[in-house]
Amino acid sequence: MLEQLPYLALKTPPKTTALLKAECADFIVKEHLGYEMSGDGEFVALYVRKTDCNTLFVGEKLAKFAGVSERNMGYAGLKDRRAVTEQWFCLQMPGMETPDFSQFELDGVEILTVTRHNRKIRTGSLEGNYFDILLRGAEESDELKARLDFVANFGFPNYFTEQRFGRDGHNLTQALRWAQGEIKVKDRKKRSFYLSAARSEIFNLVVAARIEKSTINQVLPNDIVQLAGSHSWFKADEKEDLTALQVRLENQDILLTAPLIGEDILAASEIENEIVNQHSAFDPLMKQERMKAARRPLLMKAKGFSWAFEPEGLRLKFYLPAGSYATALVRELVNYTEE
């Protein structure tokens, strides 16, 4: 799926090959919630380091150890399994003593902090993640350095990557079958996965079309643009001066966006409208599930982006806001294979 999408850096696929996640320690993720724990309240908050562990599995084990239902366990986001990741979990335990988590044992899990918090850590309630990635076997070259400079200065396509679509695109296939009435989906989690895959596919196709038409950095009539640093957006319609908006785009005051489709269809640029209309089979599903339309930036620029060539390969360090994928950045640099 992702291999069919165009590249932005140098307009060509990378020549350098590398191994991604050859070892768990090659892919380090540290969650940034954007707020501090209150220190008191009915929730026990745990900052956990996991190595080669599934987020849900660890959360379930923590809940079982504390003697509470899995429904009373919360986390901000799922993290890669084959990695070393640090993230917060919470357990709702009103009027109960904080368990002695020094007695908690699970292979690959280390509890770094135990405190209290006054509200549940909910899915999506994080600002972003810090990444430390080693691309094994990536050798220094002029081509790779040019790609690094490009990504540092101009960013990368904000594609959804393989995690969003399931193994071999299974979630997208099931979403289409569901939309066409071939299957019924009763499981709430599966419904969410399938809807996300459908919305992500359409988003990716719009980004790809903008790259192919060389309009990824050009404000088009009826584009939906987002104010940088916020979730507010407006349409570049006849009331707006496109030349002035282009200057604001180049000054990074605004961002171009593509759709995460929902029940309310919003007309936008011709490129976007054409792709959305081609996938109208999903429209009844979006209305049935009461999905709210949203916008997502076409491009993403990593904060604190740095790199160093080491004996084992290329090390990258950067920060991305929640919802953006490190592998979307990596694919602009190297032709990687995941272990």
UniProtKB/Swiss-Prot annotation:
Any Gene Ontology biological process: pseudouridine synthesis
Active site: D80
GO MF annotation list: pseudouridine synthase activity; RNA binding; tRNA pseudouridine(13) synthase activity
Chemical reaction(s) catalysed: uridine(13) in tRNA = pseudouridine(13) in tRNA
EC class (word): isomerase
Superkingdom per UniProt: Bacteria
Record EC number: 5.4.99.27
Described function: Responsible for synthesis of pseudouridine from uracil-13 in transfer RNAs.
Name of the protein in its database record: tRNA pseudouridine synthase D
Organism: Haemophilus influenzae (strain ATCC 51907 / DSM 11121 / KW20 / Rd)
Organism placement in taxonomy: Bacteria, Pseudomonadati, Pseudomonadota, Gammaproteobacteria, Pasteurellales
